[in-house]
Amino acid sequence: MTRIKTILLLAVTSIFIITSCASNKEPEPQELEGSVKTEVLEHKGTALGINELPVWVDTYVSTGISGLEKLSDYQGSYCFVGEEIGTNLDAVQTWASTFDVSREIAATVSSRVDSLFTGASSGSPDGDYGTYFENIVKASANATYSGARKINDWWILIRRYDPDSRKKHTDEYRVFVLYTIEKETLDQQVLNMIDAIAAETEGTSDAQKTAINNVKKIMESEGI
């Protein structure tokens, strides 16, 4: 089952331990109960003698998108990560090669636009912005955004095990696909959409137009 996430991927009780053990066998899931720990058995770089996970993977797993966007390599960009989990390496690699980031971008932008307008409102967003609020959230979720660039993809084979009995474990592959968009590029697309929806929305009062312009000022200085 495909899951795209932009949140912390592992439970706080889990840890990553890079080991030199490589497995060519199909992982055999076993029942786990209670607290579990996690270790990396193998990853994309293992065959090339690369022991450490890429910084972007390690950062994303540990701190999510917010941590990833603080790395010097991605300052000035918005980051989007797609993830697939499965028990077959070929299957997750195929997923990574065909991953379409557009839906992830649209969902993220819509969520951030919703939060931006809600946070800037003095009361109910519907009261401050009228029908415009609903229109802009819908439009941002359905829009197609340009400028996304694939940076890298990486798979890891993870073993989740019972610390009291390592024989009780499950193995799974996780693949991550990283895309970025320059903040200036995406912000301008969203600002253009804000103006377009405002022009199309009927019955917007002067007070609501002022509230919308205030949100634009916040976005121009801070981004989405």
What is the predicted role of each segment?
Residues 21-224:
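Domain-level marker for long, solvent-exposed, non-transmembrane regions
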Residues 1-22:
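Sec-dependent bacterial lipoprotein signal peptides
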